């Protein structure tokens, strides 16, 4: 029998779904992200939400100031900004974002789906022209894939979304087209907003990323979709099921949205990751102050940036597919977003260590995912190309 590998080298990963928060929290979140990743797609659900290119650029400036203050070298981390899509986002904002070079995607939150999502989209028909402009300018759409109606069980919100809503977002499954100067983004060839084909026909080439998929239905949807559709998966949804959050007591630091699912769902995610190059890393690292998690109405989100690659390595090794880790973390995402993979390399070394019970977070602390437990892999310094 072969001895297990003592170390594993891979191209520097990126994170295609990351929450840094704002203000004093950046002193913790930015250097942690920069240690793990070269680039990260930064979520826009601040208060107020990042709804314009100018707001995204101002937020990026604050992130880079925090990076500099941490002592990290300039250029060691590239925050790729996103804009929060609302019912009133004009098509002109897509053009401004695309031309800025700072904004890499727009984020669609169904109103009320997760933290700070009250300003999210209430009806896809209201953003048809904006989605058309995104396809025209090659701007991807990141989607939080859950329904939010009160009659749907929280554990079924993603299942219902993929059974009833997801197809309305999909474009013709062809490669991203060259922008057509004669394309009219306000023209809708199917005027009935209640029919899914309206969006399929009106936004050809739109690239869609279904973020943090958690169910067998979500995994199957991405597997069966065309080349313009991708998915991301978090470390917690690969490692544990809902028992970890609920059995033997409620563990608020395991609570995230989409919520942890069944063991059957977890295994379906692992199998999809094993076979599909359009599924890639997206930690959804989402820190909250300890007091906002440990109370009678705690916030959703797991903070995983402190050990993201170590957590993914554990999940991949347990699933017997460590050889797929580099594709998932380092090459699948850049290929879908149309950017070059990183040339620097990192090493994960087999080394047992204990995750701290808490980490600084502004004037309080954040409890990281797997706090107080032992991990078997540890990230080493970056290597030259």
Where would I find each of the regions flagged by the language model?
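Eukaryotic N-terminal low-complexity, Ser/Thr- and Lys/Arg-rich leader segments
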Residues: 1-7, 178-180, 184-187, 382-385
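Histidine-centered catalytic micro-motifs
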Residues: 12-23, 141-147, 233, 285
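Divalent metal-dependent hydrolysis catalytic cores, especially in the metallo-beta-lactamase
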Residues: 15-16, 29-54, 68-86, 102-116, ...
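Short, acidic/polar
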Residues: 23-30, 88-98
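Histidine/acidic residue-rich metal-binding segments in metalloenzymes
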Residues: 93-107, 116-175, 182-281
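His/Asp/Glu-enriched, well-ordered alpha-helical/loop segment
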Residues: 202, 274-341
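Mid-to-C-terminal alpha-helical segments outside catalytic/metal-binding sites
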Residues: 309-384
């Amino acid at each position: 029998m072969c001895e297990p590998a003592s170390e594993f080298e891979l191209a520097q990963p990126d994170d295609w779904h990351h929450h840094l928060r704002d203000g004093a929290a950046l002193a913790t979140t930015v250097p942690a992200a920069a240690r793990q990743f070269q680039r990260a797609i930064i979520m826009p659900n601040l208060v107020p939400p990042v709804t314009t290119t100018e707001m995204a650029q101002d937020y990026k400036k604050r992130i880079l100031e925090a990076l500099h203050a941490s002592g990290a070298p300039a250029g060691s981390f590239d925050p790729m900004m996103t804009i929060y899509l609302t019912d009133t986002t004009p098509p002109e904002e897509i053009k401004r974002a695309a031309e800025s070079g700072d904004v890499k995607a727009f984020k669609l939150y169904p109103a009320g789906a997760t933290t700070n999502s009250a300003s999210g989209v209430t009806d896809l028909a209201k953003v048809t022209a904006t989605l058309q402009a995104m396809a025209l300018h090659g701007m991807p759409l990141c989607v939080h894939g859950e329904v939010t109606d009160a009659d749907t069980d929280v554990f079924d919100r993603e299942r219902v979304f993929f059974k009833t809503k997801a197809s309305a977002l999909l474009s013709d499954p062809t490669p991203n087209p060259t922008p057509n100067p004669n394309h009219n983004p306000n023209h809708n060839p199917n005027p009935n907003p209640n029919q899914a084909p309206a969006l399929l026909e009106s936004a050809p080439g739109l690239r869609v990323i279904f973020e943090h998929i958690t169910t067998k239905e979500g995994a199957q949807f991405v597997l069966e979709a065309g080349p313009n559709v991708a998915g991301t998966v978090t470390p917690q949804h690969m490692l544990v099921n809902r028992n970890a959050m609920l059995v033997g007591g409620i563990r608020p630091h395991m609570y995230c949205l989409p919520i942890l699912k069944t063991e059957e769902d977890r295994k379906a995610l692992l199998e999809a990751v094993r076979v599909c190059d359009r599924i890639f890393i997206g930690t959804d690292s989402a820190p909250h102050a300890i007091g906002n998690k440990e109370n009678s109405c705690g916030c959703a989100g797991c903070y995983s940036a402190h050990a993201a690659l170590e957590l993914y390595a554990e999940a991949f090794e347990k699933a017997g597919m460590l050889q797929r880790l580099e594709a998932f973390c380092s090459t699948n995402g850049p290929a879908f977003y149309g950017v070059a993979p990183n040339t620097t390399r990192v090493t994960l070394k087999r080394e047992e260590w204990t995750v701290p019970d808490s980490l600084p977070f502004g004037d309080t602390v954040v409890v990281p995912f797997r706090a107080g437990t032992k991990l078997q892999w540890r990230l080493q310094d970056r290597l030259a190309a």
